[in-house]
Curated annotation (Swiss-Prot):
Stated name of the protein: Uncharacterized protein y4bN
Species: Sinorhizobium fredii (strain NBRC 101917 / NGR234)
Pfam families on file: Peptidase_S8 (PF00082)
Glycoprotein is among the record's keywords: no
CDD domains, per database record: Peptidases_S8_Subtilisin_like_2 (cd04847)
């Protein structure tokens, strides 16, 4: 399969310019245990970097408790989602791809079944699908990256089994039928249906930004995502890491990914760094964003595509990270982060209050090739001035053959109050 995948993606990219690939396949014999990824995943990671393409992979499906006792699909949901046997299927653990899990569009009951007390739904709208496989990814990184609608299951005691969209369309996702001479449309349930929906969103981003790199597409999509409140509430009994392992960064908001609005501004850049170097980007902060007690959020998303090697324990050959600094002059920031010779002495210390406490912290986010974190203010921040600085660092690993690492960064400023943030920031940038 890896060689076939390489041949197919390379040919489609070279001959037809295809830049988005959706792979709704998985090896049921290769459940990712958090250790090394397989050769299939490594091949996709290599192709994403070599060809500058967006590869989207379904997380994989599993019947609740593998179908041993079907009624447990209802009574023990959502606990079984975190079982060891419900981890991602190869190649969904790949690092440079977008891995997609599934959420339900509703309870799956149609008009005929809604009044039958014997039929029991498992989910409500926007809760994790009972078949969706989960992370975390390599080294504890965030996987799946995103979720989208992929259907649900219902328990039908009349036939003593769980039923999905294949035979109860209300439980599934409407799609075209491959046997179109018999019937044009059909339905189904699975992450194989949620992955193409993310592919559509990626296509919309490329239509708006035709020259965007794969890194920028990933960064914009993941920056826009939010975990549905219904999913968070359903998973909270399973602990703090359950939401990240099941839903990743959440469900894409396509308008948010592609556009700014009056109270929300998205800035982005594409760049590359030599190994063991860093870059500092100024983020203008309008006065209206600094003042008052309204809730304001800065969200940062970094995406890069490191070289990988399947045979190594340290799979990625390059690492990247970021910090958000406020209240400091650029010269001080450069002095703080640059490498220093021994004769120069220690670097100048930076007070904690100047280093924005982004969540999740670096130990969690730096395990992934798409890193997202944010900070929310509920009081005035005038004392830190009208410029924040984003420090992006590139750290060498085993990939000594690599000179520079490409990446994309997205920074979003969001203010809940009714203010014309976009207009104020545009004036600052033009000035």
């Amino acid at each position: 399969m890896p060689s076939q995948m390489r041949e197919a993606i390379t040919r489609l990219n070279e001959e037809f310019g295809c830049r988005i690939f959706v792979i709704s396949l998985g090896d049921k014999k290769r459940v990712f245990d958090g250790g090394k990824v397989g050769t299939w995943a490594a091949t996709l990671d290599e192709l994403a970097r070599e060809r500058n393409v967006v590869i989207i992979v379904s997380a994989g499906n599993r019947g609740p408790r593998a179908g041993s006792r079907v009624e447990q699909g209802v009574t023990e949901y959502p606990d079984y989602l975190l079982e060891a046997n419900n981890r991602l299927l190869e190649p969904a653990g790949a690092m440079n791809v977008i891995t997609v899990g599934s959420i339900a569009q509703g309870d799956g009951l149609d008009a005929d079944m809604a009044g039958d007390v014997r039929v029991r739904p498992i989910t409500r709208a926007n809760e994790p699908s009972p078949f969706s496989r989960v992370g975390p990814g390599l080294g504890g990184g965030t996987k799946p990256d995103l979720v989208d609608v992929g259907g649900t299951l219902i328990f039908d005691p009349v036939v003593a089994r769980l039923r999905g969209g294949e035979d109860r369309p209300s439980a599934g996702v409407l799609t075209l039928n491959h046997n179109y001479l018999n019937r044009l449309f059909t339905a189904g349930s699975g992450t194989s249906y949620s992955a193409p929906r993310v592919g559509f969103s990626a296509g919309q981003i490329l239509a708006r930004f035709p020259g965007a790199s794969a890194n920028l597409v990933r960064a914009l999509l993941i920056n826009s995502a939010e975990v549905p409140q219904q999913a968070s509430e359903r998973l909270q009994i399973l602990g703090s890491e359950a939401v990240r392992s099941v839903c990743g960064h959440g469900l894409i908001d396509l308008e948010r990914a592609g556009f700014s609005d009056d109270a929300r501004v998205t800035l982005y850049t594409e760049d590359e760094l030599p190994l063991d170097h860093f870059a500092v980007y100024r983020i203008p902060i309008p006065e209206v964003f600094q003042e008052g007690n309204t809730e304001r959020t800065i969200r940062v998303t970094l995406a890069y595509d490191p070289p990988v090697r399947h045979t190594r324990n340290d799979y990625a050959g390059v690492g990247m990270s970021f910090r958000l600094v406020r209240g400091c002059e650029p010269n001080f920031i450069f002095e703080h982060y640059r490498k220093r010779a021994e004769v120069e002495g220690p670097f100048p210390e930076m007070e904690n209050r100047f280093n924005c406490k982004l969540e999740p912290g670096p130990k969690v986010r730096e395990k992934s090739s798409v890193q997202r974190a944010s900070i929310t203010f509920k009081r005035g921040i005038e004392q830190y001035g009208d410029s924040y600085y984003l420090v992006v660092r590139c750290e060498s690993g085993w990939a000594t053959h690599v000179d520079r690492q490409p990446f994309a960064v997205v920074v979003e400023l969001l203010q809940k109050a009714e203010v014309r943030l976009y207009e104020r920031l545009r004036q600052r940038v033009r000035a």
